[in-house]
Each structure stands twice: as C-alpha cells, then as structure tokens.
Amino acid sequence: NYYSKREKKLKPILYFAANEKTLIVADSISKYYAININDGKLNWIKNNIAPFNSQVKVFKDKFFVVDFENILRCFSIKDGKEIWNFKTEKSFIKSQQKLSLIINNDRVIFVNTLGDVSSIDIKTGNLIWQTPTQSSDIYENYFSLKNSDLILENNTIYFSNNQNQFFAIDKRNGVIKWIQNLNSNLRPTFADSLVFTITLEGYLVAIDSRNGNIVRMTNIINKIKNYKKENIKPIGFIISQDKIYLSLSNGRLIIIETLTGKPLEIKKIDNEKISRPYVLNNNMYIIKDNAILKLN
C-alpha cells in the first residue's frame, strides 16, 4: 500500500495508464508512481507541486498528465523525472472535472479547465497551435464548464460541453470546422461517418461529421417513468454494431437500437450512480461503488 493513513482520509482519486510492463498512477493529492505489472512492486514514487486532474496517457518511454494548475507534464516512465512541461492559463477556481488528452503521432492534444484546446509537440513540449473555445468575457462560464472527452477521427477532434457547444476542430491547424448547439459533456462516439452523442436532456443525436448537421435526434430518457421528477441524467454510453448502451445516474442501463434510436430494454444495475460502460475482450463492464460488474 502506497498511502499513509492521513492520505487515505483525503480519499484520493486515482488516474491510471499502462504499457506492457508498467502501471502508471497519478492522483488528486499530487502523488504519481509506477508499479511493475508482473510482480506488483513499486518502481518509483514522486510528488508533484499540484494535484492531478486528467487522464494519463502513455507513449513509448513517456507518460503525460495535466495538473490543477492547467500544466501538461511529460514524465519518464523509467524513473518519473519530468522531461518537459507546458503551461496554459490558470482558472480562478480548481475544477474537479477530469481533463482529456489524446496522443496522435508526434502530438499530444488536451483541453484545459478553461476550454482551451492545445496541440503540443510530443518530443520538445513546444506549442503547435492553441484554440480557445470559450469567450474570455464570460467568466462565469469557466466556473461551471464541463467538457467531454476528446476523440480523434480523420484528422478531426470532436468534443462537446455543458454550455450547448459541440466542436469539430482540425487536428492539423486548430481551425474550428463547425459548432453545433448541443448540451453534453459525455464522451462522443464516431461510427460510419456519423458522430453520436447523448445530451444532458436525454436526446440521442447523430451528427454528420462533415458539416455538423443533425441527422437524427431521439428522446430516449422520457421512456423512463418519473425521469424528470427524479432528475435522472445520462452518465456515458458505448456503441456496438447494432446497439447503444447508456448508463444513467439512477443506476439503470438503457439498451437502444442504433438504427432507430428506440429503447429496447432498461436494466437495473444498482440504486446509485454507475459508470459509463467499458468493453474489454468482448466483455462489458460497469463500475459502481466499490465493485466492478461484468455484464452478459
């Protein structure tokens, strides 16, 4: 165990990434460390000057993570030493949202708590381009801004937020291709030239990836009895060949027909919030409080 009693009381949030030999952990109390996957032994452990609040990404002999100061940091997997860092503008408050990173070829691309998307040279840490997505005049938006994960398809970055904005950004130069008015901080999914998302109001939306036009919008949450009264919110979704699996804040999982957007089944997983579904080796998993469930 790598935490003292005092640290355990802080209930740190852990962020993971791994390669074939090493598990990398960064947490919300500024610690980061590496564990040998084969024997579980600690390779090294270090402390950052600020807590971490992003995904961790591994690329060759390096890993990348963003801290609460909106600084992207590149570390060595071998010994944990910092190789370079890239600073972006700090926010007035420390957002609790987990920030998203993607790695593509020679670039690491991330969005900070202010909604600025930055593309960084993976070797040098130099800025390639930066695209702000929020007006600097509307400071109150920063306090409540929650972005979805970034996804990358066909040289285009897609993501959305809870400020009624869905973006398509050119990976090569940071130019915004289009913006659609959709309210969602759920990770979108790309399939057959369409981008799928589910809004916080419960609408399944299919978007033409080329121009941002909405192809279809279907209300799926209203199929649940008393969904408005109970303030049920979508948590996350995945798409299979013919079905969409959507987890909800009330512990339910909705199975939706992809072609029509029609809900097929509602499964009770728990009475509390559950995670977005995950797929590993053709099996689906959902995380709930203190447990990981494998679904048939």
Residues of each region from the PLM?
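Loop/turn-rich, solvent-exposed surfaces of beta-rich toroidal or solenoidal domains
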Residues: 190-207, 213, 217-256
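C-terminal closing repeat unit and adjoining cap/tail of repeat-based domains
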Residues: 173, 243, 248-296
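Short loop/turn segments that connect beta-strands within beta-propeller blades
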Residues: 36-40, 76-80, 121-125, 170-173, ...
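Structural signature of WD-repeat beta-propellers
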Residues: 27-28, 67-68, 105, 112-113, ...
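Extracytoplasmic beta-rich repeat domains
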Residues: 1-17, 41-60, 82-105, 127-154, ...
